[in-house]
Each structure stands twice: as C-alpha cells, then as structure tokens.
Regions:
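Extracellular jelly-roll beta-sandwich "head" domains, especially the C-terminal globular C1q domain
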Residues: 1-134
C-alpha cells in the first residue's frame, strides 16, 4: 500500500537513528551518507517508489523501467514489468543534522518473505562540518 515503507527487520541500527516503526532515518551528524535500497514487488506487479530527504524527492525507483512522455500508443504488453523485476538504487547524499530520509512507495506492493527481498541501508561515509553552516 502506498506510503512510507517501514523496514521493520533491522540487522544493524547503531545509535538508533532509524525508526523501524515509521521507516524514517534521522541524520545524527552532518556529512556524506551512502544510501542503498532493493525493492522487490509481487510477481508481475510494477513497483514505483521515491527516496525522500526531509520530505523532498531525491531519487525515483521504477521496476517497470523508464517511460518517456509520448509512449501512450505502445502496446500494453511492452509497458508491463517483467516477472521478478526489481527497483534498485545506490547514491551518496549530503545530509545535515536532523535531516530525515525515507522511501515512499507510490505504486505497487512489496513482496514479503522470510528472505530479505526488500532492503534499505545507509552509512555515514564521512562527517562534513561545513554542511552544518549551510
């Protein structure tokens, strides 16, 4: 169902800055963070999501692939997601103290299993005190 994705199976949460109930990470330090996610949808179902930093979209994941404007006349079969399609991203973001990061599901349903099919991870690469002054 659309909304913020709560990654409730936490493998590591040093400092407790990720809230598994809300799905929101709050940056404890200003710096550069590496953020990654793999989103797995139900078979034959497109998954679309947005990585948000302090409620502003930063990156978009679309398991159906990129569709530029003007493709409305293509056959439906060409625009369907393939079985087992994934949405994946990995990026480095500058975060200030108190910035929040979350993944908001826009469309589709994520697969649930005992296996870790859908994951989110983040790590501070290095602290940057100049970001605190911005």
């Amino acid at each position: 169902e659309p909304g913020t994705v709560p990654f409730d199976r936490v493998l590591l949460n040093d400092g407790g800055y990720y809230d598994p109930e809300t799905g929101v990470f709050t940056a404890p330090l200003a710096g550069r963070y590496l953020l990654s996610a793999v989103l797995t949808g139900h078979r034959h179902e497109k998954v679309e999501a947005v990585l948000s930093r302090s409620n502003l979209g930063v990156a978009r994941i679309d398991s159906g692939g990129y569709e530029p404007e003007g493709l409305e006349n293509k056959p439906v079969a060409e625009s369907q997601p393939s079985p087992g399609a994934l949405g994946v991203f990995s990026l480095i973001l500058p975060l200030q103290v108190g910035d929040t990061v979350c993944i908001d599901l826009v469309m589709g349903q994520l697969a649930h299993s005992e296996e870790p099919l859908t994951i989110f991870s983040g790590a501070l690469l290095y602290e940057d005190t100049e970001l605190e002054q911005v």
